[in-house]
Amino acid sequence: MVMAANIRCRLPLEGIIRASMATKAPVIYEIAKSELGYTEFDPMSFVEFVVTENDRLGNTSVPFAIHGDHITVKKPEEKGEVAELIGAELAAGFTTFAIDCSHMENDPNLAATLDLAQPVVGAGLGLEVELGEIGAKSGSAEGFTQPDEAAWFIEGLSKGGIHPNLLAINNGSIHGTYFGTTHEGIQLELTKKIWQAIQPWKVDIAQHGITGTSLDKITQFIHHGIRKGNVGTFWQNISFGLAMNQNGNALTTAEKHYIKRPYRGVPDELWAKMWKWAEETGNTGGNIKKANKAFADELNAVGKEFKERITLQAYEEAIRLFEATNSAGLAGEVVAILTA
């Protein structure tokens, strides 16, 4: 299983790269279509940043991928805009793509995915598709993807000449922070049944929404067909210096206010400024993520002391995740596959 890290600001990347090099763990660096709207990055600058940092840190032996996460289509008329984004990410050097039409019903999802996947498949690059909107609360089994649906979807793609590597599903995870009494609820037995249902096409599972999941549970993912695991909000928590529980979920008050640790992350003064902005602009709760763009210049300019403590925490936590995902030491195997 390979960890995928969503990079919303520049601060945690060095620690993740250093951990990847130390453990010989391949890693996927990714950014979602939505994140391109609330971070400083566009497709080209994202690739340039990731590649430049790997070069600067001397990574010459541990492979990494650059992934277009959640390239989302919510309705058919958005396909043209999304096709342009796929083209821009192809031109920038992205190596894998997650085409996400899961907000639509199954039939239009299949049709849109078949269409949008063509340039990715034509370029011989990696493809992830999605069935069942992540975090959905309505529909069959409260929105959970079902094995028969998954088999129908992958078979339909295959008949259309599209053979994805990974299927993202709704199996009980959410994106972002678990607030209040909500808690992590990834259904591993359902996940395994879905994986088994799509094995005739040799497709594996991509697990979204890992932030807030225990390391013990993550170690079980590989036994349930999961081969890629997305971690995003966790790195933001580290960068902002937020208090977290043992599973990496941010600790919050009843009003969804975060708790800043004075010895973690960005300077307290910068966090206070960010939170004031969030309150004034209606971006509290999960929308604090939008501070990544609004405060990009100040985040990039934090002093050495703060950058180093973010790097150190990201390094240690990335090592734990590489170990839990069983990806430590896999670099050689990946290189052998890529060069065969």
Predicted regions and their residues:
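Active-site beta->alpha loop and helix N-cap motifs at the rims of alpha/beta catalytic domains
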Residues: 33-119, 126, 133-136
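Glycine/Thr-rich beta-alpha phosphate-binding loop at enzyme active sites
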Residues: 160-193
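Glycine-rich phosphate-binding active-site loops on the catalytic face of alpha/beta enzymes
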Residues: 93-107, 173, 224-243
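Active-site glycine- and acidic-residue-rich loops that bind
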Residues: 7, 103-111, 133-152, 211-215
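Active-site-adjacent beta->alpha loops and helix N-cap segments on the catalytic face
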Residues: 43-47, 78-79, 102-125, 180-195, ...
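Hydrophobic faces of well-ordered beta-strands that scaffold small-molecule active sites
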Residues: 2-7, 27-31, 62-70, 95-99, ...
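C-terminal extensions of enzymes
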Residues: 275-340
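Catalytic cores of alpha/beta
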Residues: 75-86, 212-225
